[in-house]
């Protein structure tokens, strides 16, 4: 059977084996799920979470470097050049580690998720290809000019190189999140029963997908916050030690100002993401809120509680009236559907999906499109959007058309993701976000009053706050990706269908290998970062440009 499956993959018919052939494939889905599916998900989660330790800092530091160097070019003050070089060194260390950990991410689609790659490769691969050709090469080309062009380029020329690095970093995030946003809201595409694949029908719709755009601005804003808190904390450490005081004060001022603006934007853009999720991923919102029953509008927000998924209730729940209704619907009259109602809707979708599945079998059996009765085509067209729900039954039965009512109910219940981890991951993320607004706001006020070094206890808080934006970012990733389960493509392709036919021992071995390698890389990153921070900024002997008469005091 392994040889047969391999030949089907080579012939480009992997999905046909899953959608058409009764017998073996269904059996393997049921038997493999606990090992291959879970292990493949675990491997992707581990590598993604490791990679995302480096991405936010790269996004944010690239912009902060552009700001600092712009001030240097405009004022000619040597300390701003020194700041740009120092923080640029830390950016370079992080950038290299981000590239090293990111390469594996794309290979996994072919290694562990070959069915997924075959099914949607034409759509998902396009943004990733553009990212590599446009954004990554832009970033990789100009990052060399940033580090080695200080004495070879003019001020403005080097500044343009720095801007190009920042643009490349953010363009990379844009294209990757366009691909991810399509997985969350698969617009501009349709299933072709002749090729058994998803195909692009409107690339502009994929590009302008509102979910993708909201994810992009929310994610890059989170990266700006991460870099701001990093610069804030390191600068606070310098002030506590009495080292590089002038550089630290200016860096802290930039970080507090930029961080406050970014923190506020994260909240606003996160609200937009929540609103769009309630439109396109209602189950995710219901699970985040542990909303078991549909509440009368406007729904309340559960601040605290212990969700019990088995009993479908939340113990010791503390609610704030109206808040969730305003966030999720932006109205006082529109209800937010609860988990139980959504499960019932999923059961109806599964039954409609079975109708589409049956029509697809007839279309494929006819061989020639012209030989397919029009009424069969119409039935498939009317119900094809639900065919992914029929594939949820592959866990329990070889042929979804043979599913019992109990199996359909069980598959409908599978559409509920893990409520407890989602509930708390979201609240940890939000709690940290509001704390960082308070922290950056406090230092913004202290900076305006020129009292940055007056309160050592606040500086210590800033130092200890350095890990917080990373924790919030990882929690956000969990909310976005774990909340999409059981779908690898929302409503289209279940996660259990997307995996490759690998042995569990093979996947487990690669997990252990990746964990070992990534842990070593993380330790190297931390060691290099700490060494560079302890060494401090290098003295810059280049004469400072004279842009104003000596009688005019330059701005701090």
Across the structure, where does each feature detected by a protein language model lie?
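Aromatic-rich transmembrane-lumenal/periplasmic boundary elements in polytopic membrane proteins
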Residues: 175, 179, 259-365
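Membrane-interfacial loop-to-helix junctions in multi-pass inner-membrane proteins
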Residues: 75-93, 119-125, 129, 149-167, ...
